[in-house]
Amino acid sequence: MKRAPTKQPAKPAARGGERAQGRVIAAHGRHYIVAPADGGSMLQCFPRGKKSEVAVGDRVAYERTSADQGVIVEIGERRNLLYRSDQFKSKLFAANLDQLLIVLATEPYFSEDLLGRALIAAEANELKPIVVLNKIDVEAALPVARERLAPYRALGYDVLELSVKGAPDDARAQLAPRLAGHSTILLGQSGMGKSTLVNLLVPDAEAATREISAALNSGRHTTTFTRLYPLQDGGALIDSPGFQEFGLYHLTEGRLERAFPEFRPLLAHCRFYNCHHLHEPGCAILEALADGRIAPTRHALYAQLVHEASQIVR
């Protein structure tokens, strides 16, 4: 008499050693928080090997090593990648972005150098840049801020004027449609109102930060990690600290010159094909600088970035 076949139990999902898919939503050192693609609880992951090449926003494959930990075994193809860099090293920190949102304010006085660098990063990575001028209710400082931003408006950059604290509903109405469905990196100096803006757009941001901080074992007061917040209308907001460390040392000179939109129509008109646009005769960029078509501050930024890039060994 034949025995009835034994019924096999259902196969459990994502057990230890089995691969699963997810997205990196926070990073601190070599510690990463991954949100599983199937909607399960987030887990702390570490990269396989000594070198850490993972960025917030990466789509990854991971293998669980315990109920709440895993190891990242593969990184999906990236659309783009942003770096934080100085002359000694470059560290990737955000990937798969659509937009770059820079928060400025009427006061304190914002750094035009940092604004310029952020815009160059956006152009070099084909991200849509959005400039926010916050605290427009500080009326005494508003005319000067507008005057400083006028050259950027003339270059075609969006500048949104709002007051996150004074008129939060208006701020949300301006920003929400622009962020919906897109992955946006948020940058801003201290004092510009970036944290207030995050809390406006992501109501549970503080709770999420505490949860991620605890999961990273980085201390309850630690907020110096890049993190991704899903948005209610789709898309995501990536908040990264340390705007001052934002560098462009990894860009080649060719990518750098094309990241200035006012340079691009002129590049083919320089006398020399390998023109550096610094002191060469017959340079179309220098001619445009001399007759006022290119702002001196923009060319000075270009020259500074070329100098910085020349100081490192590639």
From Swiss-Prot:
Domain CP-type G, first and last residues per copy: 85-246
Cofactor note: Binds 1 zinc ion per subunit.
Residues the record lists as binding Zn(2+): 270, 275, 277, 283
Pfam families xrefs: RsgA_GTPase (PF03193)
Top-level taxon in the UniProt lineage: Bacteria
Gene3D superfamilies: Nucleic acid-binding proteins (2.40.50.140), P-loop containing nucleotide triphosphate hydrolases (3.40.50.300), Probable gtpase engc, domain 3 (1.10.40.50)
Necessary cofactors: Zn(2+)
GO biological process, one term: ribosomal small subunit biogenesis
Predominant cellular place of this UniProt entry's protein: cytoplasm
Record's subcellular location: Cytoplasm
Region (Disordered): 1-20
Top-rank EC class of the record's enzyme: hydrolase
Keyword annotations: Cytoplasm, GTP-binding, Hydrolase, Metal-binding, Nucleotide-binding, Ribosome biogenesis, RNA-binding, rRNA-binding, Zinc
EC number: 3.6.1.-
Function summary: One of several proteins that assist in the late maturation steps of the functional core of the 30S ribosomal subunit. Helps release RbfA from mature subunits. May play a role in the assembly of ribosomal proteins into the subunit. Circularly permuted GTPase that catalyzes slow GTP hydrolysis, GTPase activity is stimulated by the 30S ribosomal subunit.
NCBIfam families assigned to the protein according to its UniProt record, in alphabetical order: ribosome small subunit-dependent GTPase A
PANTHER family assigned: SMALL RIBOSOMAL SUBUNIT BIOGENESIS GTPASE RSGA, SMALL RIBOSOMAL SUBUNIT BIOGENESIS GTPASE RSGA 1, MITOCHONDRIAL-RELATED
Family: Belongs to the TRAFAC class YlqF/YawG GTPase family. RsgA subfamily.
Protein name as it appears in the record: Small ribosomal subunit biogenesis GTPase RsgA
Organism encoding this protein: Burkholderia pseudomallei (strain K96243)
Gene assigned in the entry: rsgA
